[in-house]
C-alpha cells in the first residue's frame, strides 16, 4: 500500500514503479512469499495540505528575508536525525556502518549473479563490532554477524523431527562455510584502504544466521516499522571500546 500526500504535475505510474522495485529487490516468485509481478498494489495518495505546503515551499528564514540559497526549501514538520561524520572512512560514515553496508552489498551481488550461494533470498542484515583503543582509533574487527534469508535447499530424509533438525543444521553449516569462504574474501577484496584491511584477522568471531533457519522473511515474514516510528535506525553512537552498527539490504 502506497499512502501519503504529494503535490505534483507529473503523471507517475506508481503501481508499476512499486512492482519494478519489488522485483529488482528480488521478490519475484510466490515461492519466496512475495511476487512483485502479481501482488496487489493499493495507492491512496492525496494532495498535500495547503497549510503544510506553505512551510515546504518556502523556509521560515526565506520568509523573514534571510537571503540564503539553502533556505529556499522549507520543512512541513519536525524530524529527528542521529549520526555523525568521521574520518574513519572515505565517505565519512562510521567504519562499522560502512563495513555492514559493504557486506550486504556484496551479498546482494552474489545473489543476483546466481553462480554461487544460489540458495540466497533478498532479506538480510549485518552487524560489525569493532574494538577501539583509548584514543578512539579502530584496532581490530571483533565480531561480524550475517543473517540471510535462504531457500529450504536441504530436505529432511523423512518426516521426523530429528530428520528436520539434521537438515536445518546442514543448511546452517553450508551457509556459514560460504559466508566465510565466498562472501568475506570478496568483501575484503573490495576494500582498498590499508588501514581498514589491517583490521581483519583470524580472531574475528562470525555469527551466521545465529537464530537458525531463515526461510520465511521479507514482506511475508515481517511488516517492519519503517515509516511508522520517529527513530529506530541510527548510525554512530560509539561506546567505550566496542561499537556496533547494523544495516539491512535494500
Outline where the language-model segments fall.
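Histidine-centered divalent-metal-coordination microenvironment in nucleic-acid enzymes
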Residues: 1, 145, 228-231
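Short, charge-patterned binding micro-sites
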Residues: 1-8
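Histidine- and/or cysteine-centered catalytic micro-motif in compact active-site loops
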Residues: 5, 211, 219, 235-237
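N-terminal low-complexity, intrinsically disordered segments
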Residues: 13-19, 50-56, 219
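A glycine-rich helix N-cap at a beta->alpha junction
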Residues: 19-30
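Glycine-rich, mobile lid/loop segments that gate access to catalytic sites or pores
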Residues: 27, 36-216
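A glycine-rich, aromatic-flanked flexible loop/lid motif
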Residues: 223-242
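Conserved small/polar residues in nucleotide/adenosyl-binding loops
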Residues: 243-248
Amino acid at each position: 500500500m502506497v499512502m501519503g500526500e504529494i503535490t505534483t504535475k507529473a503523471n507517475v505510474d506508481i503501481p508499476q514503479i512499486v512492482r519494478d522495485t519489488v522485483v529488482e529487490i528480488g521478490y519475484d516468485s510466490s515461492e519466496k512469499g512475495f511476487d512483485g509481478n502479481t501482488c496487489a498494489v493499493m495507492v491512496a495518495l492525496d494532495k498535500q495540505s495547503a497549510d503544510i505546503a506553505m512551510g515546504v515551499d518556502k523556509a521560515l528564514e526565506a520568509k523573514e528575508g534571510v537571503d540564503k540559497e539553502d533556505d529556499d526549501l522549507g520543512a512541513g514538520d519536525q524530524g529527528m536525525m542521529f549520526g555523525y561524520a568521521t574520518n574513519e572512512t572515505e565517505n565519512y560514515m562510521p567504519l562499522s556502518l560502512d563495513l555492514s553496508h559493504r557486506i550486504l552489498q556484496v551479498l546482494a551481488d552474489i545473489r543476483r549473479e546466481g553462480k554461487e550461494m544460489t540458495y540466497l533470498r533478498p532479506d538480510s542484515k549485518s552487524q560489525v563490532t569493532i574494538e577501539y583503543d583509548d584514543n578512539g582509533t579502530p584496532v581490530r574487527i571483533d565480531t561480524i554477524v550475517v543473517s540471510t534469508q535462504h531457500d529450504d535447499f536441504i530436505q529432511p530424509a523423512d518426516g521426523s523431527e530429528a530428520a528436520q533438525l539434521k537438515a536445518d543444521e546442514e543448511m546452517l553449516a553450508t551457509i556459514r562455510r560460504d559466508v566465510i569462504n565466498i562472501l568475506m574474501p570478496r568483501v575484503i577484496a573490495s576494500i582498498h584502504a590499508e588501514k581498514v584491511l589491517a583490521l581483519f584477522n583470524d580472531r574475528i568471531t562470525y555469527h551466521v544466521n545465529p537464530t537458525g533457519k531463515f526461510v520465511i522473511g521479507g514482506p511475508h515474514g515481517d511488516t517492519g516499522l519503517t515509516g511508522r516510528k520517529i527513530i529506530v535506525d541510527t548510525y554512530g553512537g560509539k561506546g567505550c571500546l566496542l561499537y556496533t552498527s547494523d544495516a539491512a539490504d535494500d
